[in-house]
Swiss-Prot record:
This is Uncharacterized membrane protein MT0380. It comes from Mycobacterium tuberculosis (strain CDC 1551 / Oshkosh). The keyword Transmembrane helix applies. The chain crosses the membrane at residues 27-47, 63-83, 126-146, 153-173, 186-206. Belongs to the DedA family. The lineage of its organism: Bacteria, Bacillati, Actinomycetota, Actinomycetes, Mycobacteriales. Disulfide bonds: none annotated. InterPro entries: DedA-like, VTT_dom. One of its GO terms (cellular component) is plasma membrane. Its main location: membrane.
Length: 227
């Protein structure tokens, strides 16, 4: 594997999970579905998203695919939707307590507050848009649950988002899998996908850091929780 890709944290490298010597090895379909469900349903945002689905699509386009695209694409879309339903009802269950959870290695309070701001800005369309934004796609369904967004509305928009993201990115990898340039530059393409997908989160983190540095030292305003 190239230096560029090995420079990525292992957990964000799709081949760490799906490679011949990866965590899941040849079990590509179960591996992808497990990771998608953990990221979307169990509030663990630090996993590969678009790069994993794109890689799965590429593998399904190989001469001896570990899984066919006709099975992979709908299964990913279905599990993505099921994961969001889980996250929505977690939000309904725990409510505003999520905003008070202390930071840990894999959880930062600003993940929730920024997802809440994203939700407030775009409303119900957030359910679709957040699918393509790492971290936001993990926490926006929870925020929808905390906000008691009407479930039929959430479900409808989530199905659209789940199909667009889960099946769409996977199909993109499948159809581009026959392009020689993609095969020759696979590692760099995956690195680019990871970078582009993380860019919004990096920009947001930079803004938060700059705002904290420039803010006067005073007691922070209390967070207004969704109704």
């Amino acid at each position: 594997m190239s230096t560029a890709v090995t420079a990525m944290p292992d957990i964000l490298d799709p081949m760490y999970w799906l490679g011949a010597n990866g965590v899941f090895g040849s079990a590509v379909l179960p591996g992808i579905l497990i990771i998608v469900f953990i990221e979307t349903g169990l509030l663990f945002p630090l996993l590969p998203g678009e790069s994993l689905l794109f890689t799965g699509g590429l593998l399904s386009a190989s001469p001896a695919p570990p899984v066919t695209i006709g099975v992979l694409a709908p299964c990913v879309a279905l599990v993505a939707v099921l994961g969001d339903q889980t996250a929505y009802f977690i939000g309904r269950r725990i409510g505003p307590a999520l905003f008070k959870k202390e930071d840990s290695r894999f959880f930062k309070k600003h993940y929730v507050t920024e997802s809440h701001a994203f939700f407030e800005k775009y409303g119900k369309w957030t359910i679709i848009l957040a699918r393509f934004v790492p971290i936001a796609r993990t926490f926006v369904p929870v925020i929808a649950g905390v906000s008691y967004m009407r479930y039929p509305v959430f479900l409808g928009f989530d199905i659209v988002g789940g199909v667009a993201w889960g099946a769409g990115v996977t199909l993109a990898g499948y159809f581009l899998g026959s392009v020689p340039f993609v095969h020759m530059n696979f590692q760099l393409i995956i690195l680019a996908i990871v970078f582009v997908s993380l860019l919004p989160a990096l920009v947001s983190a930079a803004r938060v850091y700059r705002a904290r540095r420039n803010a006067p030292q005073s007691d922070p305003d209390p967070l207004v929780l969704p109704e």
